[in-house]
Amino acid sequence: MAMGVPRVILLCLFGAALCLTGSQALQCYSFEHTYFGPFDLRAMKLPSISCPHECFEAILSLDTGYRAPVTLVRKGCWTGPPAGQTQSNADALPPDYSVVRGCTTDKCNAHLMTHDALPNLSQAPDPPTLSGAECYACIGVHQDDCAIGRSRRVQCHQDQTACFQGNGRMTVGNFSVPVYIRTCHRPSCTTEGTTSPWTAIDLQGSCCEGYLCNRKSMTQPFTSASATTPPRALQVLALLLPVLLLVGLSA
């Protein structure tokens, strides 16, 4: 009978540890969706999940610059590095924006709830100045969303004298969607927009000059550079491995 006492104590301690671990878990809202216009989550009853450390919410938006956005909204457990820097290129088009927020109390990821969290990515110049170029404009997550029959004709603003068409991928954490776009652009055709350790927009495409010249078919599949380039962590590990082996042999 006495032999069973330590086992009972061990089981009780193990159960207490499980209870303690469970009590330390955070309750975070869980949600992901793609929007093609203004959104408002305030009236929605969002599901919640248990997270080990921190809650997370993020918004990533890409716009033609002519009142046509695609916006990714994601809430859940914090993933990825605990800190990082958002990088942006003021000369890049199409216009984009990302905001990421982490927090450490129950259901605290309820701040980014409406389209008001985003700036106006279709700001018309004041005074209105046209470049003289005219291009097709569209954006969507399917090739058919950017068929010529579904694309608008827009008069381009200011220094946007070229037309652009391309495709790519928008990513927030592990939530990712394809994107297809036609719009106005500058002759430099710079597309590297806002990036961070938690969000990314990878676009490839081409610019042209001429009346409605961005009319080619959207049939080319997008291939991200990350598919052929090893992640940075693996590159660093590959560089450090020979050094670690030498240290181990000399010890």
Curated annotation (Swiss-Prot):
SUPFAM superfamilies in the record: Snake toxin-like (SSF57302)
Keywords per UniProt: Cell membrane, Glycoprotein, GPI-anchor, Lipoprotein, Membrane, Signal
Intracellular or extracellular location(s): Cell membrane
Signal peptide (from-to): 1-25
Chief localization: membrane
InterPro entries per record: CD59_antigen_CS (IPR018363), LY6_UPA_recep-like (IPR016054), Snake_toxin-like_sf (IPR045860)
Residues cleaved off as propeptide: 226-251
Glycan-modified residues: N120, N174
UniProt topology in membrane: Lipid-anchor; GPI-anchor
Keyword Ribonucleoprotein in record: no
Lipid-linked residues (GPI-anchor amidated alanine): A225
Domain UPAR/Ly6 positions: 135-214
Any single Gene Ontology cellular-component annotation: side of membrane
This protein's name: Ly6/PLAUR domain-containing protein 5
Name of the gene this protein is made from: LYPD5
